Amino acid sequence: MGTILDKIVEQKKKEVAELYEIYTPVKTKRKTQSLVEALQQFTVIAEVKRASPSKGDINLHVDVRKQVGTYEKCGAGAVSVLTDGQFFKGSFHDLQTAREESNIPLLCKDFIIDKIQIDRAYEAGADIILLIVAALTKEKLKELYSYVLEKGLEAIVEVHDEQELETAIVLNPHVIGINNRNLKTFEVDLSQTEKLGKRLNEEKLLWISESGIHSKEDIIRVKRAGAKGVLVGEALMTSSSISSFFEDCKVNI
């Protein structure tokens, strides 16, 4: 059967093959925005997330332009956009729309397995690329991280457990993302932030917490663990008061 992650990666291989047939990267350079700079103070990376494998449809018909505008007005330090179509109902068009609306750092959230996806994300306006350790071999991770640097972009290298963390640390990446969600089962455990955060604090690396963050209590918990930011999707996409969530994020510990 394979895990959910296995199925997603298989789909990505098909999409990459199609991209090579229909898409030619444009050789242009543009100015990019820095997530590292934004993370000098506690930052919310606010996500545009229409759907997910675990929750189904979340906010399928969201007005991306309006949502991103609200995020920026409420104080988001960066915006994340799901570009996976099959499992998350996102698109590169959503990413491009977000770029047109906002000048803050923009993350392409996808399952990146090939350089051509990075080219496509760059052209759509991304400043940051998500690289998921669980989806890549060590060699491929290193190759893609080098390519991100070559393009003048930043990377969030995402980990879920100790083994993946050690793989990520070797790269000395811009930012490490601790995903509280196990991508093999899609179960969420916020204690992963506390466990892995200790090691990252020792290494003095910049890191954020991803997934399962819904409340003021969750924000306090990840701040205490040492996170410099949070990536929040579902809670914001279903919120009746986005501004209240951002106010909760300002809590002092």
Swiss-Prot record:
Similarity comment? Belongs to the TrpC family.
This chain's protein is named: Indole-3-glycerol phosphate synthase
Do you know which PROSITE patterns this protein is assigned to? IGPS
Which keywords describe this protein according to UniProt?
A: Amino-acid biosynthesis, Aromatic amino acid biosynthesis, Decarboxylase, Lyase, Tryptophan biosynthesis
Q: Which domain of life is it from?
A: Bacteria
What this protein catalyses is:
1-(2-carboxyphenylamino)-1-deoxy-D-ribulose 5-phosphate + H(+) = (1S,2R)-1-C-(indol-3-yl)glycerol 3-phosphate + CO2 + H2O
Q: What EC identifiers does the entry list?
A: 4.1.1.48
Q: What class of enzyme is it?
A: lyase
Which pathway or pathways does this protein act in?
Amino-acid biosynthesis; L-tryptophan biosynthesis; L-tryptophan from chorismate: step 4/5
Name any one GO molecular function.
Answer: phosphoribosylanthranilate isomerase activity
Q: Please name the GO terms of the biological process aspect recorded for this protein, alphabetically.
A: L-tryptophan biosynthetic process
Which PANTHER family does the record cross-reference, listed alphabetically? INDOLE-3-GLYCEROL-PHOSPHATE SYNTHASE, TRYPTOPHAN BIOSYNTHESIS PROTEIN
Q: HAMAP family annotated for this entry?
A: IGPS_B (MF_00134_B)
What Pfam families does the record tag this protein with? IGPS
- Does the keyword section mention Transcription? no
Keyword tRNA processing attributed: no
